[in-house]
Structure formats: C-alpha cells, structure tokens
A protein has these predicted regions:
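Active-site bordering "gate/hinge" segments
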Residues: 20-344
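Bacterial N-terminal signal peptides
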Residues: 7-16
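Positively charged n-region of N-terminal signal peptides that target proteins for export
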Residues: 1-4
Length: 344
C-alpha cells in the first residue's frame, strides 16, 4: 500500500512539473530565434566591426477589429501578423552605433516574419538572416559616422554609457488557448451598432462611430547574454467618436475610450450608451458655445487628462535616449542616480 501511494505521488509530481518544460521545449519559434542569434553572433564576430551585443525581439499579434457608424456595421475582421526587430550594437557601451540612430535601423524599423514555423522554418530563418544582414550594414555605417562625429565635436559632459548591463533573465509563458485570442465578431457587431446608433438622427452631428479592438501580443525576446523571455499581452479597447461643426466652421470632436486586459471586463452597453448620450449633449452645447479666449493660469485637470499631461511633461524627459541627444532639453541630464520625484 505504501509503495502504491509513493508511486501515485511521484506520478502526480511528474505531471505537475511537465507542462512548463514541455511547452517551452515545444515552442519552435523560440528555438529558431536562439539558434539564429547564436549563429549570426558567431559569424559577425569575425567581421571588422564585431557586435558587443545582439538581441532579437518578435511580436506575434492576433487582432480582432469591429467598427460601426451611425448604427451601421462598417468593419469586422480578425488578422494576425508577426514582426521581427533585431538590435545589433557595435563598439562598446561607452560609444556605439545608437548614439545618433536611436532605432538602430532605417525605416521601416521591423521586418515581417512568416506565421507558420512548422511548415516554413527555412523561410523564417531566411527572413531573420536578411534583416540581421541589413541591420548590420546600417550599424557599421552609423558606427563609423558616430566615431567621426565624436572626434570633431566638443567633448561631452555626459559620461553615462549608451548601454547598461543587466542580469540574465529566463521567463516563459505558455501560449494562450485559441479561444482566448479571439472574440465573437457577431456579438460585438451588434453591441457597436447599438452604441453608434445613439448619434443617428441627431442634428448637427457629423461623426458617430464606435470601435472595438482586441489584441493579443505574444512577445519573444532573446539576447546574446542568454536572456530568454516569452510572454503574452492581451488587451481590449472600445472607442467612441463624435464630431460636430460650429457655424463658423470650427470642427469640434470628442471621444471616449475604455480599456481592459480581458474583453469581458469592459463596461456594459448600458454604461457606454449612457456616456455616448452625454457626449451628444456636450457636442450640441459646444456647437453653439461662444469662442473662449486664451487663458494662462492655474488649472485643474481630470484624472485621464492629468495622466496624459504628466506623461508629456515628465515621461519623455526621463527617456535615456533624450538624455544623450544634444537636440533635446536634457532636463535631467546631470541627475543620473538621483531622485527626480519624491520617494514617498
């Protein structure tokens, strides 16, 4: 009896710890990315300008889009795409090819990859090689320009490196079930037609649209230091747009936006329709309202507006690349390692 219990318990533990390992091992795209990165890094090490760091980032996107206007369905579709963004750094962390080229490539800054790795492995490998080759050529050109420009420029006060070392990370999420990557298009078409119908037969309303977008991103990241990260990012948005025009010709648009990580957590139609009706009232009031004179002084911002304001006046100013760019304000240039906001 004791042996039987031990055997059953051992089998249970085996089953408990198999799924994660099995899922990661069966993720063919992850394996392809790791193999190609190692191979390309090995080959480029023999070039005149060898990379000191490389990484591959792939975003596999499944999207569902439904839109309606004035109660009529305008669009209903699901699609999938996969893009690759390699990064190749030449030189070293004190001076590399990203000094003047923050994206590390000419436009477009990403390449399309085939979707079916089971039947198109060679095509995926070829696409990775092509984009890596293009990025490397651009990296060499930018690195040579950077060195030449740095030689003739006045020595910079900023000695912060262009690249930071971080610990190696290993993280893997299994793919979401297929039913979690899509929505019922017919159900959402019905909902959006009801929402956008609020604008129908409203005098002076020029636009009355509603749109729902559900996106599931599966993100892959591997680098030459050994980091491997695979994770899922699902998110859903409903957007409502309304617009009118004043007698003097001024266009007056308004919009509503609702966000959730899961479509089932989005507001009900009753809530959105009520908000849309309030939008119609506001649009009608704006159309006949007198012109407001410019104002300079204190202002109170709503929650969403304050978030955007904070992002614009602070968020962009602490971006690393903006600290290195002479064409930017470099507000916090000399505050690396210091608090720029209250700690509490």
């Amino acid at each position: 009896m004791r042996k039987t219990v031990l055997v059953i318990f051992s089998c249970f533990l085996s089953l408990l710890f198999v799924p994660k390992t099995y899922g990661q091992g069966q993720d063919k795209l992850l394996g392809l990315l790791k193999e190609e990165l190692a191979q390309q890094m090995k080959e480029l090490k023999g070039e005149e300008f060898p990379p000191y760091h490389m990484n591959y980032r792939v975003i596999d996107v499944t999207s569902s889009v439904v839109s309606a206007s004035f109660g009529a369905l305008m669009n209903s579709q699901q699609y999938r795409s996969r893009t690759l963004v390699p990064q190749i750094r030449l030189g070293d962390a004190t001076l590399d090819n990203f000094k003047f080229a923050q994206m590390g490539a000419q436009q477009p800054s990403s390449a399309r990859l085939p979707l079916d790795e089971d039947n198109n492995e060679d095509a995926i490998r070829q696409a990775i090689w092509n984009e890596t080759n293009n990025r490397y050529k651009f990296a060499v050109d930018m690195y040579q320009r950077t060195k030449a420009q740095t030689t003739v420029n006045v020595e910079e006060e900023d000695k912060a490196p262009y690249f930071s070392e971080v610990p190696v990370e290993k993280y893997y999420e299994a793919p979401l079930p297929v039913e979690k990557t899509k929505i019922d298009l017919d159900e959402w078409a019905k909902r959006l037609k009801e929402i956008s119908a609020v604008f129908k037969n409203q005098p002076g309303i020029m636009q009355g649209d509603a749109m729902m977008i559900y996106t599931v991103e599966r993100r892959y990241f591997v680098n030459s230091e050994g980091t491997e990260v695979v994770q899922n990012l699902p998110y859903a948005r409903i957007m409502v747009f309304g617009e009118t025009k004043a007698d003097d010709g001024m266009e007056l648009p308004l919009n509503l936006s609702y966000f959730a990580y899961d479509p089932k957590d989005l507001p009900s139609n009753d809530k959105i329709i009520a908000d849309a009706k309030e939008m119609v009232k506001t649009l009608k009031a704006l159309r006949v309202a007198p012109m407001v004179d410019p104002y300079t002084g204190p202002a109170l911002l709503s929650g969403p507006a304050s978030g955007v304001f904070f992002h614009e006046i602070f968020g962009h100013r602490v971006e690393g690349q903006r600290m290195k760019s002479e064409s930017d304000g470099q507000t916090f240039k000399k505050m690396v390692g210091e608090y720029v906001l209250p700690a509490d």
